[in-house]
From Swiss-Prot:
Protein's name according to its UniProt entry: 5'-nucleotidase SurE
Its biological purpose: Nucleotidase that shows phosphatase activity on nucleoside 5'-monophosphates.
Localization in the cell: Cytoplasm
Signal peptide: none
Recorded family membership: Belongs to the SurE nucleotidase family.
Length: 269
């Protein structure tokens, strides 16, 4: 296919193995690659934007293959994509890729994911965007994950990529010959037991460290067509999960089940 202008970001930071593998894979396929990503890890920042302090950027070409332009940014993943589109790029990209994330982005976890937020920022600007994650914090075959991501992205660009569609790709942590299939999936509902570790700093003041433990994964529930497999069940079966996500969060249920709100208080004397 024709060479694409591709913007790549992430939430693991400019030194992460995943983003370098993804940029390398895109370059090998003949595409023009620009990287704008956080200058350090900013996982689980959601779609946060930096409003109370300046954004600073520094060139980081030396961390990537020759021919790749790269910047490390002091902001969030969403900041990085917004800044790239507004200031750093000469022209609007044909494709935005976010990842490869070190760990899964499944189910309702996407609401706090910086990886997904970077792709969502591109989607909001009508640029075809995909978030890519390896569903393990220990598995390091990012080259394989990047190869899968590029093949999917190129096919989607060539065929039909609707406006407002974000593709959320999760790859199981296993070798190529162990992967069974790729399927469209729906989002699961994942819930956590929030565990705060209370500690004391050298000055005697308390502080808290958050670590979430997944205690409930409602694979049978969630969003999307019920005859589609859930993203979590797909990964558990060593299958690639590709979930279509859109920007529209509007309630799709019946008006009859919404709370009854009496607005008489508005004009009350």
């Amino acid at each position: 296919m024709e060479s694409l202008n591709i913007l790549i970001s992430n939430d693991d930071g400019v030194f992460a193995e995943g983003i370098r593998a993804l940029a390398r894979s895109a370059l090998k396929k003949g595409h023009k690659v620009t990287v704008v990503c956080p200058d350090q890890e900013r996982s689980a920042t959601g779609h946060g934007l930096t409003l109370q302090s300046p954004l600073r950027v520094e060139r980081a070409d030396e961390l990537f293959e020759p021919g790749i332009k790269a910047w490390g940014c002091s902001g969030t993943p969403a900041d990085c994509v917004k800044l790239a589109l507004s200031e750093l790029l000469d022209k609007k990209p044909d494709l935005i890729l976010s990842g490869v994330n070190h760990g899964p982005n499944l189910g309702t976890d996407i609401f706090c994911s910086g990886t997904v937020a970077a792709a969502m920022e591109g989607t909001l600007e009508n640029v075809p965007s995909m978030a890519i994650s390896v569903a393990s914090f220990k598995w390091k075959n990012f080259e394989f994950a990047s190869e899968i991501a590029m093949n999917i992205a190129e096919q989607a660009i060539k065929d039909n990529w609707p406006n407002a569609l974000l593709l959320n790709l999760n790859i199981p942590p296993c070798e190529k010959n162990k992967i069974k299939e790729l399927s469209w999936t729906r989002l699961s509902i994942r819930k956590y037991k929030n565990q705060f570790s209370k500690r004391e700093d050298p000055r005697g003041d308390d502080y808290y460290w958050l670590a979430g433990e997944a205690v409930l994964d409602l694979k049978s529930k969630g969003y999307g067509p019920k005859n589609w497999p859930s993203d979590v069940s797909q990964i558990e079966e060593n299958k690639i999960s590709l979930t279509p996500v859109e920007t529209d969060l509007f309630w799709r249920g019946s008006l009859d089940v919404l709370p009854k709100i009496n607005a008489s208080f508005i004009n009350a004397s």
